[in-house]
Amino acid sequence: MSDYIKPVVFKVGNEMYGVDINLVQSIEKQVNVVPVPNSMKYISGIVNLRGEVIPVMSLKEKFNMEDQSKGDNTVIVNLPDMKIALEVDEVIEIGELQPDKISLMPKLAKTENTEYLDRVASIDNKLVILLDINKILSEEEAQGIKEFTEQMKNN
């Protein structure tokens, strides 16, 4: 990942996060999420977007936030082998970051389960956590979601 990125900045709970715009397919408002019983804790369901079945991830659940209310916006991102919809409260802006406004994520904030917390940036004097969206799912989680999505396509 180069130092200069244009992130799509969004709010989840009280925090701001960003994802490289090159990985974002679209931003959708109020999609109809169909709940899937017995799915992974942070998969809130699936959505049929222009004929394509896409799993929906609750970032509040993934990040263990107390506020579990549903967001009004969905950011569709392209992972290496699939697409996933990220439930967010609000899309703030498409930012433009200079290299001197980006720092590595402090080591104290990173664990084996938070490898996706990539870097931190300052946009308009606000801290934005930049997500490495390719690491948001473990290989095992990604495989489970891929298999589930394939099953849904075949039904």
Q: Whereabouts are the PLM-identified features?
A:
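An acidic, low-aromatic, low-complexity terminal/linker signal
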Residues: 1-155
